[in-house]
Amino acid sequence: MALENKLGITNSAELAREEERISKRKAVELFESGALDKLAPGRFTSLQAIHKALFEDIYDFTGELRTVNLAKGNFRFAPLMYLEAALGNIDKMPQSTFDEIIEKYVEMNIAHPFREGNGRSTRLWLDQMLKAGIGQVVDWSRVDKEDYLLAMERSPIKDVEIKVLLKAALTDDVNSREVFMKGIDHSYYYEGYTTFKTEEL
């Protein structure tokens, strides 16, 4: 059964295709309009704006805090009763060095504030923080899917793996359209969305 959506789609495979197509196009608009650079780096309100921009044509809940508890495998994300407090604490975390930025990213992943689309939104949010803080972004096309997912799974206990993995993929090409497009495709590939190439939408 598909998640309730504005498109009236009840088939989950069909919804996944449309979600990929529409939200990838929205990601391109975010980049090309310069809207990403206008958001305050590292703030939850900025993550909300990114999430809303990507998914507002598909879901009613975009940018809104989830109303259910979420888990992935054996890992439970921040319980609802602590979610708002967790987000307040994340906003206050420092973000002036690479390590601080990744630690903030890991905490936001644990918070998982939205019902759907957390990973894709948060990777854009991370790059925006890196760009503002250290003048670099992640070239996601250089980050292996299995290595990334495993490192993120372990990151709540030990964040050294995700730091090493992402540090090795940093690039100074912060305004490169090609790096951004490839990054979107890889970000979606991590979540199993591989039907469309961003460049062709």
Which residues does each predicted region cover?
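FIC/Doc superfamily catalytic core
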Residues: M1-L201
